[in-house]
Amino acid sequence: MPLSYQHFRKLLLLDDEAGPLEEELPRLADEGLNRRVAEDLNLQLPNVSIPWTHKVGNFTGLYSSTLPVFNPNWQTPSFPDIHLHQDIINKCEQFVGPLTVNEKRRLKLSMPARFYPNSTKYLPLEKGIKPYYPDNVVNHYFQTRHYLHTLWQAGILYKRETTRSASFCGSPYSWEQELQHGAESFHQQSAGIFSRAPVGSSIQSKHQQSRLGLQPQKGLLARGNEGRSWSVRSRVHPTTWRSFGVEPSSSGHTNNFASKSASCLHQSAVRKAAYPTFSTTKRHSSSGHAVELHNISSSSAGSQSKGPVFSCWWLQFRNIEPCSEYCLSHLVSLLDDWGPCTEHGEHHIRIPRTPARVTGGVFLVDKNPHNTAESRLVVDFSQFSRGSTRVPWPKFAVPNLQSLTNLLSSNLSWLSLDVSAAFYHLPLHPAAMPHLLVGSSGLSRYVARLSSNSRILDHQHGTMQNLHDSCSRNLFDSLMLLYKTFGRKLHLYSHPIIMGFRKIPMGVGLSPFLLAQFTSAICSVVRRAFPHCLAFSYMDDVVLGAKSVQHLESLYTAVTNFLLSLGIHLNPNKTKRWGYSLHFMGYVIGSWGTLPQEHIVQKIKNCFRKLPVNRPIDWKVCQRIVGLLGFAAPFTQCGYPALMPLYACIQAKQAFTFSPTYKAFLSQQYSTLYPVARQRSGLCQVFADATPTGWGLVMGHQRMRGTFVAPLPIHTAELLAACFARSRSGAKLIGTDNSVVLSRKYTSFPWLLGCAANWILRGTSFVYVPSALNPADDPSRGRLGLYRPLIRLLFQPTTGRTSLYAVSPSVPSHLPVRVHFASPLHVAWRPP
């Protein structure tokens, strides 16, 4: 008869009417019993022929194909003008006195951040925007392109102008200015651009300098003959240097000319381009002047083309006969002025050689489950986490649950700060640009690739087979709708573009590491500037605690001003005041301890409601289930050991079948959650020790010993001794000389014993006693007569490796006291 849930509870000693612990507990270590229970509960059956279940409630396998939902009305979030101050270390030192070595090292890591992978795979531009939403291809293309444009305008992306130059908006950093083409320096650096020096000077002389910036007087067209050899022909129509990804610069300074001339048509992806004959367009430079642009007439186009070649796919629809009522020429003729073909940033810099390719695809999703009105850009740089091009990301300490509780469980008032676009605060060195490229191939190529009837551009000669191939009702309808949203920007966005990251992107394993180092260093500085405040952060989640609400408010003002002075942008609308129970990292932390947040508890209840019984569940779905249950495991009676059967089946990549008893057991475990309490420091009075055959305890001056029925593995024996010590003495502090017991991880013990021991030892702290000094050593060997004095062992709770309290160097005396207010606190508050 299968094991019922009541019997199972009794077996695990979870009920009160169990017999004496010294007899019952060793029985749970018996291998035979564990095997019989496992068979009864269906925990280790061989592979089953019933088909696996691949979905449980909302959980599907890790590589599930649940497509995200496209929202045609997504708003692109706005990004503040984020510019982290370059001399952040000096600013902190003015504020708080000398920084510690640790803080300096962490801050220097991200000023600027560097990223040098061993090898980088380049993908064609068509893969720049992922076709994630097959029914909304065009809409998704423009929304994504608009998002990238917004990031570029906010100074978060570089725009690739030529193979070796890029432009960006916002304030430059010193490592970027060093690369800038000045009027003079350009000629010395131009060796990489022109093969013969005189070309540079001849170009310069042919251009008059006016207050409008650089204007072509008699045009020149530098044309790629083969590879990078250059020739200059002067009997050509008035021109500007236009080619793919490089179009005349809009800032009225000499150095822009570098980007124009350097651009010329020598990139392979670009060879298809020169410009059609239309009117001269006026357009405004970033410095506010109008710059005249003249276009190349089609007769002067590229060297090997057969017939006229146009680069601007969009504007060609202006002068041709419509092919049908859905021809794009109807849309293009709506406006006379579609604006420039490309825009240029305020600053131009030299960059390492960057091909006209991308290294990762992008697509849009909802900003978060609670905010579906705004979009979020997902960047897939997974090539750096997979296969031969894998980069070993740096490891960093994440505070574990006990450390977090020791640190934050107190009677303080709390608030949490919201750092807006935290990742985009940290600057990347321009040398990383060639590895982190995103972009798009332009609308014509994108549409051609996705529609079966149209042919992609003829690469060999760069001719467009037939403009009307791309006209279709779907495209026309989508573009007419988008015209209402984007207006003349449709033209700008229909051009190809390549962008590199100027701030750290979210899709690279380096970013979380850098952000964690950065915010922890800043919090360390804040804690020393305001000694009676507790500031703590994990990634972009920053919390402040103080003894009273008034105190907290004045701290909030002071800390916010300090962070703003460093160039860190906070979102004041999202500041949350928690009172005495802090919500942080998915937990609720109060003076009583820590519990999981309510939404997680609800998720667990729903999970159990939908768990099928006696049906094999795909191990990938089990991973999802274990992920959720594992988060709340420390708050249950049996903890992680209860989930061991699930872990085992995931490791074996086998399906798992929940028996009614095992499901009832887990469901009961998670129905009552117990808080994890803060550890207290204290003097250890109770010691436990064991040998394979016997155990011994010392409680103050009382000593006990006992023997096991059969010899046991030493770790198991030590664990049993610790359980006896806890149940006999009730002490929350026990001395032991076994490292496995000290670690409080009971997952490697026989399953039933692990579950029972977890419940008995819940909330117990252990202190390490070397065997030679352990008073319980003699009793465990059966020698009660010998008496050795108790050693004074002090237990200090740890805050793990969260490196909280930087040793503060002496602050120079002339610095004023930071916080002036009637504080109820006359002494600096120390951590609990």
From Swiss-Prot:
Activated by host HSP70 and HSP40 in vitro to be able to bind the epsilon loop of the pgRNA. Because deletion of the RNase H region renders the protein partly chaperone-independent, the chaperones may be needed indirectly to relieve occlusion of the RNA-binding site by this domain. Inhibited by several reverse-transcriptase inhibitors: Lamivudine, Adefovir and Entecavir. Mg(2+) binds at residues 418, 540-541. Its EC number is 2.7.7.7, 2.7.7.49, 3.1.26.4. Keywords: DNA replication, DNA-binding, DNA-directed DNA polymerase, Endonuclease, Host-virus interaction, Hydrolase, Inhibition of host innate immune response by virus, Inhibition of host RLR pathway by virus, Magnesium, Metal-binding, Multifunctional enzyme, Nuclease, Nucleotidyltransferase, RNA-directed DNA polymerase, Transferase, Viral immunoevasion. One of its GO terms (molecular function) is DNA-directed DNA polymerase activity. The record marks 63 as: Priming of reverse-transcription by covalently linking the first nucleotide of the (-)DNA. Residues 336-679 are annotated as: Polymerase/reverse transcriptase domain (RT). Hepadnaviral virions contain probably just one P protein molecule per particle. Belongs to the hepadnaviridae P protein family. This is Protein P. It comes from Chimpanzee hepatitis B virus (isolate United Kingdom/LSH/1988). The gene is P.
